Amino acid sequence: MIKKIPLIIGGEVQDTSEHDVRELTLNNNTVNVPIITDKDAESITSLKIENKLNINQIVNFLYTVGQKWKSENYSRRLTYIRDLVKFMGYSPEMAKLEANWISMILCSKSALYDIVENDLSSRHIVDEWLPQGDCYVKALPKGKSIHLLAGNVPLSGVTSILRAILTKNECIIKTSSADPFTATALASSFIDTDANHPITRSMSVMYWSHNEDITIPQKIMNCADVVVAWGGNDAIKWATKHSPAHVDILKFGPKKSISIVDNPTDIKAAAIGVAHDICFYDQQACFSTQDIYYMGDKLDVFFDELTKQLNIYKVILPKGDQSFDEKGAFSLTERECLFAKYKVQKGEEQAWLLTQSPAGTFGNQPLSRSAYIHHVNDISEITPYIQNDITQTVSITPWEASFKYRDTLASHGAERIIESGMNNIFRVGGAHDGMRPLQRLVKYISHERPSTYTTKDVAVKIEQTRYLEEDKFLVFVP
């Protein structure tokens, strides 16, 4: 049976019975997505949703949606899990975990408030004029936010959409061909909750191909007030080329991440954390560990313990399906490393691959839970492989060691320093790829105080004409 993906415009599922369709092949299954028309583009670009919600109403709506996702019997959740397994090759455990995380994010009311508080300085600034310095300041939405989503990490799309919702922007969401399910399921759950809610009505979800005629998609891109682009270099270049010149583009492009193991006393705890950071999303995420740098004299013990923990993850979070080409790349990498006489171990049925090699000797990286481990003496042997704008996450075990290295790592380009085993949890208050995204989704408006309002440095009213007439400007210079 062919899976049909709906077209959602303004929170309404469109009748696409007369639309042409594009066939996507996912995990050897066919998915049909409607090809957007001129009429669709006109509906999207002309849509204007009045959002007078305050932050409390926004968070409460998201919480209500999250409670639906929390129910293991929610039909939308069940369908989503089946789609991830059938079409994206996720193991049932991975798919269930993804749905669990959607519910966790939506139901974490305190975290949603704190995201706004930390990024924008106050959770009230999106609702009220706040006194700041000699002004009153308010953060208004940019307007129409276009989200060009990637398919490797479904939760990145959820995060992108929630950031726009928290800042009261409309969402025009272009799904990835690899994952046309997540954004559609999320928007559909909004419809299930309240079809007439302003947040629901501000959601439009569709797909178009970058490699075909983009005349109609370009009309949609031209209406953007802000663009959020996720994906590889080609996706980021496409977004840059096709976005209006005047709009801000938040670029979440390709990154790499590493783990540092600093002579741990608890070898097992260190291995558990590193195994998690290798296995989560099968290394498809920017934050996934690909290289491990070990400092200390128990590398062999750690290597053996890490293989045990990778085998445990094979059971508790099984790897997703691999294509023929992916299996071939995995086997080729293994043979290349064996030929180079590196220490190599792999799990049954290509569950994982661990290779010990000297620092700086990087072979192919097929991902799919394959990692290189390098023995180094100190941090100076690691910093050459930390690249500005490339290295995202550095996970460190034991955690206490991070305080020794954070200044050095940051100065060499690392964007995020975490405890091993926490790579998929972006802590509230932290930056994302070197930025605070919500700040770039709003427009700050300043209402400045009048001339009679004295400043800290000048305790008289500001009478500029008088200063010029009497040539007394310098009298007031502090």
UniProtKB/Swiss-Prot annotation:
Keyword annotations for this protein, in alphabetical order, are: Luminescence, NADP, Oxidoreductase
The signal peptide stretch is none
The pathway noted for it is: Lipid metabolism; fatty acid reduction for biolumincescence
Q: Which GO terms describe its biological process?
A: bioluminescence
Q: What is its EC number?
A: 1.2.1.50
What family is this? Belongs to the LuxC family.
Write down what this protein is called: Long-chain acyl-protein thioester reductase 1
